């Protein structure tokens, strides 16, 4: 089949016609669209021409023609039309022209499809579409992009100021920036985004500078929140999504970072004030705003910590002041009770803040912890926080306690007490005081409720581990066993006629390791009681050999009948007091020294005893001279004239201050603990530097107490002397474990 | 000696006086170091001691002179006699060096074995030789390494048999003696501090670490590391110095001039 050769001129002509037609259509001139015949004609012409062999191979010229045509069109029509306009109008024109251009290129690519394929295949030239785009970029974009960008930014700023702008237009312009990058984002990023960000920065910098001076902290935050939201929306409406992070950061920086200190420290409305005034909503906002800004968030957390610490310390100070201004002990005790209650409340309040305002963020948990670690380690009127907490527990757990609460409330309170314990660094001190109080409650039957005792021990066990509570649990169990044992003892008495103590006797056998250490005294027991002891010993030996019983008379209670002139009154006294009183069955009148000799007690003990019997509320003995204090030259007589409206009275004996002993005991325990820790560490590490050894020991021991570095050093040296460790010969800062 | 020039002769004399070596050794050493005294000392000290033959019979005689009539040991009287013979004060630190050579287990007595070991190590079998060796022994104290050995030896030697620690008074006495040799400006303050604040025996660790402290930490405490592993007592000492204004702003104020 012979195809007619299409000459160059002819071909070019066809091409031009086609291009012109499209141009006219796009220009909006009255021009009928392509009909299929025209279309086919053109398409085929190009097709055939591409297949023509040399010398009729004019594809290159066709290509060139195409290029020229595009270039010409752009230069003569497109560019001037854009240049002719300004601002928004220019943008509209640009958008229109760009849309047209894309359409044109599409049509032309279809029309001259084969040219495209042929050329690109043969000679690796840019496609017709690509050429067209490149021209647009090089001729139009290069020329106008600065003005376009400025126009866009102006519109953005207008919108920021509250004016309505044509968002669709902006979207189109920005899409153009993206598309003109031809696969790369660099045009958008370098020619638009960078400048937009800078402008944003400047914009918010100005705003922030004004607002920070004029507005309160909450208002400023509201405005900032608004602005940041709007900027995010802006991205959704017309900016490219890749701008979101950068835009937010820039705006955030100007609004929240640059002035962060001024904002948080604002005198009448800053963070401290918001905390003080419980402005939960504002604080939540503050958190939300700063949650992405670590530096800022840390500042907020610090203020939070300082605030809690200050409030806590203030409570402590209140208690301290109240305690020192009141003379009597009782009132001081109350203040301390109140203090613990208030600290619990403080804790509850701010835990809520952490969960609600601060969305459980770790920084705020830490701030809370650190604050309470300070507050909970303060001393009040000489009592350490460990002691205060045990006194508080005592009040909750004992029958006559000041805390009259429902079971549920008690449970809750005990929970909270255990939580507070986590903040106290001297936990071993707490354990020791607790044991002492527990002992008193158990032995003098002052515990309100066995279940409660067990409940708190369970909670303590959960929080601090089994080792913490094992002794205490042992104590509670001992009492249960003691009751059983007593029943057995009574059976024994019944079945053994020889065993007659002569007095009703109840014995509680304590397992030594569990209970606090008590001094057993060398009290000369009254004869009546000696028999009791013997009988019980007899019984006990039938149950177990190999156990040694040590009698702690200081813990005993005695019911004595006092046959006074008016009436007989039953006196409930301690065993020691009973021993004193029974002396008066044999003698009418005794001197201090006689009593001392007969009973074999220490001066301290004896003074206390005699005071409770002759100078306190109930004067069972009368004293010569009738002064309010006991001196070694006093004489005592049975006060037969004594009477009371009750038939049975309890004569209290004020307890010795245990504090010193507890502190000493704990000190000793700590030395052992430090020793053990050092050995443990060195045994596993074999060789270790001093600093590391100290820090590992501190870590191990911190569960129970905060060890004194000097104490650790002393123990290390002790271990060197005992040949467990030695210093390295070369480096005196290194220690070696000696097996 | 006649062939030597005066300068060389002087050097030989000096060498012999300081090291206690014989003329022959002195010549050897000096020649080896091209007649530089310091070099000669290095040569001499780095060579193993030339053990001259010691006659055991002479040693027996010597031992018998000093030994206690009732026990087979040299006791306090014997030692005093020895010191007299040597023309040395019994409190002289050189006697400590002698004890060190003997590896004596405790002060104021020498067993026969210790006596023999010591004198043989020093190449002594007569009083004359013993006297000659005195200056050598004094020189040993100047050697850093030997001084440390002697110092640490002193602890075990001075303490009571069976005790782990050294009684404070004895320790102070020893320190005064030892630090007179090896000048330490803080020794008096240290002793005062101990008497005022410590009043207990001194552990071996504290003893040995004190030397390191004296050696490495400057008297104004400018390079003292409070976080270091110094024994607790030394930390307290530093506190004491600071509290009492003896060290102010890293200056050691000399109290002796302030009265």
Q: How should each PLM-predicted stretch be described?
A:
Chain B
Residues 1-135, 142-145, 166-246:
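Short, amphipathic alpha-helical interaction segments embedded in low-complexity terminal/linker regions
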Residues 239-259:
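Long, low-complexity intrinsically disordered regions
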Residues 138-159:
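Short, solvent-exposed interaction modules
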Residues 160, 165:
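An amphipathic, hydrophobic-aromatic interaction surface with interspersed Lys/Arg
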